[in-house]
């Protein structure tokens, strides 16, 4: 529900693949602003260009061609084939994973690994005539009935054979993924109540976006952080240092913190500005 207004705004401005392939990059980022994962929107445009050029403006209808497109992996390719093209495939999203874990009562780490779940999902079978509806029905079953907390088993069509229901145990075992902890020194330059930002060509995260000048600190013995921010699978510990001098060039960018909403900036940068102003 949270992303619906973003989706509607996106489709209103970019109704088809051809328009997406030509859409102005700054306006595209502005439309995406607030959703995070900016690599996804960059990949969307890259994919749109390829689809227009190589596939006659239509998404390919086979797994290998779909996976060759930027940003499309196993799940997305499976979801497109099942939902858009009615292929007899079950895309393994978080909701279907949850149904599967409870239905089969999977309680060990080795059982909830992606490879095993891909194999076990075959128990749900497929539909040859209504594959799209069937795939979405399984997703909705997880989202609306087999919820993470307080599953509504009375309404579940699978409860009679569900092993978690039989054992009255609905706790879920999650595959352990430890976030990588990183350390950065962030340099703050302030002049006339404005902050200096630079275009990021240095780090893999937020590539080509405006961020504060930063330096990565590897394996520090002592690190007194001022704040930490979560980004994807990374926890960023940040130490802030105020500076007086900086080598200016045309790629520098000054922002007024009182007009933050007027700039096209990643949420990461906005959070730091708000922290500095608090």
Please place each PLM-identified region on the residue numbering:
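Catalytic cores of DNA base-excision repair glycosylases
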Residues: 1-152, 158-161, 167
């Amino acid at each position: 529900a949270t992303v619906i207004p973003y989706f509607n705004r996106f489709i209103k401005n970019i109704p088809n693949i051809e328009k997406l392939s030509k859409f102005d990059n700054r306006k595209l980022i502005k439309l995406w602003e607030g959703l995070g994962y900016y690599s996804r929107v960059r990949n969307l445009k890259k994919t749109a260009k390829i689809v227009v050029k190589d596939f006659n403006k239509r998404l390919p209808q086979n797994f290998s061609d779909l996976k060759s497109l930027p940003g499309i992996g196993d799940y997305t390719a499976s979801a497109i084939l099942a939902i858009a093209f009615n292929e007899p495939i079950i895309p393994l999203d978080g909701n279907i994973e949850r149904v599967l874990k409870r239905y089969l009562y999977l309680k060990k780490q080795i059982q909830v690994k992606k490879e095993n779940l891909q194999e076990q999902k075959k128990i749900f079978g497929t539909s040859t005539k209504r594959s799209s509806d069937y795939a979405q029905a399984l997703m909705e079953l997880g989202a609306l009935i087999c919820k993470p907390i307080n599953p509504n088993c009375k309404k579940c069509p699978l409860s009679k054979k569900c092993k978690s229901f039989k054992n009255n145990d609905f706790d879920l075992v999650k595959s352990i993924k430890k976030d990588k902890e990183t350390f950065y020194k962030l340099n703050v330059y302030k002049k006339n109540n404005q902050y200096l930002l630079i275009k990021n060509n240095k780090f893999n995260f937020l590539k080509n976006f405006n961020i504060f000048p930063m330096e990565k600190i590897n394996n520090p013995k002592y690190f007194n952080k001022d704040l930490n921010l979560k980004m994807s699978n990374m926890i960023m510990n940040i130490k802030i240092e105020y500076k007086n001098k900086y080598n200016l060039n045309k790629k520098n960018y000054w922002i007024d913190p009182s007009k933050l909403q007027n700039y096209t900036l990643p949420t990461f940068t906005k959070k730091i500005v708000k922290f500095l102003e608090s």
